[in-house]
């Protein structure tokens, strides 16, 4: 069950536009576990509203002004609505790993 604050943040995220991306789901209480995005997903094909999501491996992280977008090996582009405790730290850790990988010319990238 979403709190009132989470509902407002989700509504705000649903109204935002990303001209270069097609959002396939909105994730609440997000965190990164083993290079996958975990949380409750909304407005995602094949998932019930609020169903637990474990994404495919993350291939790209995009930071917009107010929101993080996550692309996966499955072709999903997921918008993070809110973080679970420690979730932002886990994303920033993965971001640092992607930056290091870019120096080594790896296929993983950050935008």
Model-flagged regions — what are they?
Residues 60-110:
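Short, compact, well-ordered microdomains
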């Amino acid at each position: 069950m979403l709190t009132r604050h989470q509902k407002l943040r989700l509504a705000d995220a649903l109204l935002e536009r990303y001209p270069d991306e097609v959002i396939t789901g909105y994730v609440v209480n997000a965190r990164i576990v083993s290079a996958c995005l975990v949380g409750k997903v909304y407005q995602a094909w094949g998932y019930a509203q609020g169903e637990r999501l474990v994404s495919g491996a993350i291939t790209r992280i995009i930071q917009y002004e107010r929101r993080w977008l996550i692309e996966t090996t499955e072709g999903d582009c997921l918008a993070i609505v809110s973080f679970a405790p420690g979730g932002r730290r886990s994303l920033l850790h993965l971001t640092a790993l992607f930056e290091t990988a870019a120096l080594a010319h790896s296929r993983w990238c950050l935008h």
